[in-house]
């Protein structure tokens, strides 16, 4: 029950972030957080993490370039995606779901997940609970100036 409430709180936090960006207009919203880049060019902007929210959850914005495949992996936390733009193929334990703008998907540990994009790439808001997972993902990527 506590995990479900935490997940709902995390999703609400993501909704606030997305809503604020929509009200401000695309590209006009001030940038919050620290951005990291993976070797494949995917970026993660951690907006809420242990520095300003604590360890309960972290919220980020991930921009996947066109035609990317994350490879199968697992997380030590619940991962919730909300698609802002583009399309994301969200494959959980071999079961594929195409997520379009306004749709969400999730994965629980120890599920295996894979994220794929088509020619348009994708921008998503991601919520991890517990929040240390956001920092764990970012630790393998390069911090942007």
Predicted features and spans:
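Short acidic-glycine-tyrosine-enriched beta hairpin
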Residues: 94-110
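A short, N-terminal "cap"/entry segment at the start of jelly-roll beta-barrel domains
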Residues: 16-56, 137-145
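Ligand-binding loop in jelly-roll beta-barrel domains
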Residues: 54, 109-134
């Amino acid at each position: 029950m506590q995990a479900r409430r935490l997940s709902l709180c995390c999703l609400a936090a993501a909704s606030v972030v997305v809503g604020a960006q929509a009200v401000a207009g695309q590209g006009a919203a001030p940038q919050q957080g620290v951005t990291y880049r993976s070797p494949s060019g995917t970026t993660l902007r951690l907006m809420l993490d242990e520095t300003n929210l604590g360890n309960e959850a972290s919220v980020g914005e991930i921009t996947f370039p066109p035609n990317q495949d994350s490879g199968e992996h697992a997380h030590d936390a619940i991962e919730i995606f909300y698609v802002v733009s583009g399309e994301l193929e969200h494959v959980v334990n071999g079961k594929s779901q195409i997520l379009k703008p306004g749709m969400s998907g999730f994965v629980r540990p120890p599920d295996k997940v894979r994220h794929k994009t088509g020619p348009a790439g994708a921008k998503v808001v991601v919520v991890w609970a517990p929040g240390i997972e956001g920092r764990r993902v970012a630790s393998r990527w390069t911090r942007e100036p």
